[in-house]
C-alpha cells in the first residue's frame, strides 16, 4: 500500500486499481447525501461510472492523483490533487502567475457520513496542503467549492485558504450550472 501522507490519526494512501477500492467509491458516491456535495443527487455513481472516472487515475494514466482517506484504519473518503497550468483555475485576473511557479488543484470528499462534522476534513486538508508545499514544492494551491457549500468553505478557511472570486456557472450540479468560489492558499 503506497502511503501518500499520514499523521497519528489520518492516513491517505494511493487509490489501487482493484474492485475493493472501486467498491468504496460506489458506496460513497451512490449515497444521495454525499452526492449532494459531489456532482449532485441526480447523478449517483454505479460501478461502471466509478471505473470511467477513476480507473485511469488509479492506473497512473490520468495525472490526477487520488488518495483514499483512512481514519484509524477505516476508509472514509478520498482526496484528489493535480498540477495546474496558468489560467486553468480561472485565476488569471486575480493572481499574478509570475509570482508562482508550481500550482496544484485539489478536492476532498468525506464519503462516510459518520465522520462529517468531526474535524477530519479539516485535518486532512491541512495534511494535504503541507504535503503539496513540502513534498511537491507547490507555492500556491487552489480549490473551488460551490458557493452554497458553506461547510466546505469554512473548512478551507480554517487551514488558511482565502476567497479570491466567484466563478459564474462553474459546474453542472443537479442539472443546473452552479457558481463556485475560487480559493487559494500560498506557501
Q: Language-model segments: which ranges?
A:
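Terminal substrate-recognition subdomain of acyl/acetyltransferases
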Residues: 1-2, 169, 175-187
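A short, well-structured alpha-helix characteristic of acyl/acetyltransferase catalytic modules
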Residues: 1-55
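Glycine-rich phosphate/pyrophosphate-binding loop shared by adenosine-nucleotide-utilizing enzymes
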Residues: 10, 74-78, 178
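Acetyl-CoA-dependent GNAT
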Residues: 48-115, 186-187
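Conserved acetyl-CoA-binding loop-helix of GNAT-fold acetyltransferases
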Residues: 117-131, 153-158
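Conserved GNAT acetyl-CoA-binding A-motif
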Residues: 134-144
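Conserved beta-strand-loop-alpha-helix junction that forms the acyl-donor binding cleft
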Residues: 143-153, 170-177
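Conserved active-site tyrosine of GNAT-family acetyltransferases
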Residues: 156, 161, 183
Amino acid at each position: 500500500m503506497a502511503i501518500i501522507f499520514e499523521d497519528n490519526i489520518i492516513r491517505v494512501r494511493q487509490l489501487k486499481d482493484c474492485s475493493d477500492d472501486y467498491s468504496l467509491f460506489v458506496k460513497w458516491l451512490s449515497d444521495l447525501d454525499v452526492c449532494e456535495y459531489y456532482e449532485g443527487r441526480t447523478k449517483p455513481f454505479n460501478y461502471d461510472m466509478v471505473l470511467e472516472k477513476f480507473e485511469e487515475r488509479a492506473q497512473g494514466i490520468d495525472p490526477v492523483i487520488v488518495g483514499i482517506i483512512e481514519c484509524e484504519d477505516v476508509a472514509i473518503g478520498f482526496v484528489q490533487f493535480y498540477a495546474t497550468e496558468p489560467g486553468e483555475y480561472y485565476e488569471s485576473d486575480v493572481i499574478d502567475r509570475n509570482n508562482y511557479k508550481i500550482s496544484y488543484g485539489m478536492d476532498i470528499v468525506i464519503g462516510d457520513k459518520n465522520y462529517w462534522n468531526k474535524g477530519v476534513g479539516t485535518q486532512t486538508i491541512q495534511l494535504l496542503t503541507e504535503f503539496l508545499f513540502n513534498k511537491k514544492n507547490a507555492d500556491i494551491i487552489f480549490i473551488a467549492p460551490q458557493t452554497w457549500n458553506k461547510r466546505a468553505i469554512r473548512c478551507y478557511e480554517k487551514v488558511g485558504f482565502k476567497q479570491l472570486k466567484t466563478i459564474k456557472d462553474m459546474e453542472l450540479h443537479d442539472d443546473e450550472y452552479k457558481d463556485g468560489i475560487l480559493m487559494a492558499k500560498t506557501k
